[in-house]
From Swiss-Prot:
HAMAP family: RecO. The gene is recO. This is DNA repair protein RecO. The keyword DNA repair applies. Involved in DNA repair and RecF pathway recombination. Gene3D superfamilies: Nucleic acid-binding proteins, Recombination protein O, C-terminal domain. The lineage of its organism: Bacteria, Bacillati, Bacillota, Bacilli, Lactobacillales. The keyword Glycosyltransferase does not apply. Belongs to the RecO family. GO terms for cellular component: bacterial nucleoid. It comes from Enterococcus faecalis (strain ATCC 700802 / V583). One of its GO terms (biological process) is double-strand break repair.
């Protein structure tokens, strides 16, 4: 790698010595890279706005295959302002970026995942439902962890309509007529499976049209947690924070209105 430029999204930053920072950026052209930013704590550093958490920009610098890369300048800086300023949205955004960091190796070229991440953060920044946005991201990201469940139809007969449950034995969904084939299936709420099947293929442009009751969201969360525990094995601090946040969320904000599912 050499001098060049690429779009990128800040994954995280951490202090390095007294005045400098290490900044991990998910770049569109080179994958994930760790950058050294000298003098990052100086208030007059022109790079400062471009290396804040939840920022997307075009980054110009020395991109290296080994060791640290170096940032020279930036342009077209676009902060995800609502994510930066809202603790609740910030929590979901942090979790999404942590998932990205865990899902692919550094320097792995994945422009599709870059675009998907951009769309997820944009939807969060537009204050669309953060739980639904995150659930969609989790389900569609499973493939990056080598997990490819069959969500579209019953793995036994090809049925696409009706009630379904997830079977680890068959790596996909079973329709109600074939639940007897796996006594160890998830026994998940059929409504949760319905939405997870939808999330496996829906685009973020249609998120605003998805309405889910709070009790169903809870079932979806439990089912996705089962999938990640079984297949991925991640235990991210940002996910734990979201789980804890749900217990005190209603004391800090107005409870959401009841919604009709569709």
């Amino acid at each position: 790698m050499a001098l060049g430029e690429t779009k990128g999204i800040i994954l995280f930053t951490k202090d390095f010595k007294e005045k400098d920072k290490l900044v991990k950026i998910f770049t569109e052209s080179y994958g994930k890279l760790m950058f050294f930013v000298k003098g990052a704590h100086r208030k007059n550093n022109p790079l400062l706005p471009a290396i804040l958490p939840f920022t997307e920009a075009v980054y110009i610098g020395n991109f290296r295959e080994e060791g640290l890369s170096f940032l020279n300048s930036s342009k077209e800086v676009q902060p995800f302002r609502n994510i930066q300023q809202d603790i609740f949205i910030n929590a979901y955004g942090t979790y999404i970026l942590n998932l990205v960091d865990a899902a692919i190796e550094d320097q792995h070229y994945d422009p599709n995942l870059f675009q998907f991440t951009h769309m997820a953060l944009s939807a969060l920044n537009e204050q669309k439902d953060p739980e639904i946005i995150t659930n969609i991201f989790e389900i569609q990201l499973l493939e990056r962890f080598g997990v490819r469940p069959e969500w579209h139809h019953c793995v036994a007969c090809g049925e696409t309509q009706g009630k379904f449950d997830y079977s680890s034995k068959y790596s996909g969904v079973l329709c109600e007529k074939h639940w007897h084939l796996d006594e160890q299936r998830y026994h998940a709420d059929p409504r949760a499976i319905h939405f997870i099947r939808l999330f496996s293929q829906v685009s973020y442009e249609k998120v605003q049209n998805i309405q889910v009751k709070e009790e169903t969201k809870k079932s979806i969360r439990e089912t996705i947690d089962m999938l990640y525990d079984e297949y991925v094995g991640l235990h991210l601090k940002s996910k734990k924070f979201i789980d804890q946040m749900k217990t005190w969320e209603n004391t800090l904000k107005i409870p959401p209105r009841k919604k009709e599912e569709k």
